[in-house]
């Protein structure tokens, strides 16, 4: 049996907290203004029509409507199709 802990075992044992990233509202879902659509690191999804981007690259709805995922050139985009009044 070893009487010392070993070179690295006492330096291990940490884990970061979960960040809860990902798509929060899927295509076809109805959203209100200000609702978060995607939480992400970097721009995996780019903002489209009626979608804003926060400082941490979070995409959120600027107006009420239906979420729509699509492609523009080689980018994945998220747009909001306004609800017809």
Swiss-Prot record:
Q: Which domain of life is it from?
A: Bacteria
One biological-process term from Gene Ontology? translation
MF terms (GO), sorted A to Z: structural constituent of ribosome
Q: Which UniProt keywords apply?
A: Ribonucleoprotein, Ribosomal protein
Q: Which cellular components does GO assign to this protein?
A: cytosolic large ribosomal subunit
Entry's family note: Belongs to the bacterial ribosomal protein bL27 family.
Protein known as: Large ribosomal subunit protein bL27
Q: Which organism is it from?
A: Saccharopolyspora erythraea (strain ATCC 11635 / DSM 40517 / JCM 4748 / NBRC 13426 / NCIMB 8594 / NRRL 2338)
Q: What is the lineage of its organism?
A: Bacteria, Bacillati, Actinomycetota, Actinomycetes, Pseudonocardiales
């Amino acid at each position: 049996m070893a009487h010392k802990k070993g070179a690295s075992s006492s330096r291990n044992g940490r884990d970061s907290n979960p960040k809860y990233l990902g798509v929060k509202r899927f295509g076809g879902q109805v959203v209100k203004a200000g609702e978060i659509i995607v939480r992400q690191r970097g721009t995996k999804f780019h903002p489209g029509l009626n979608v804003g981007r926060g400082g941490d690259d979070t995409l959120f709805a600027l107006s009420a409507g239906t979420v729509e995922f699509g492609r523009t050139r080689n980018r994945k985009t998220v747009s909001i199709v306004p609800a017809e009044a």
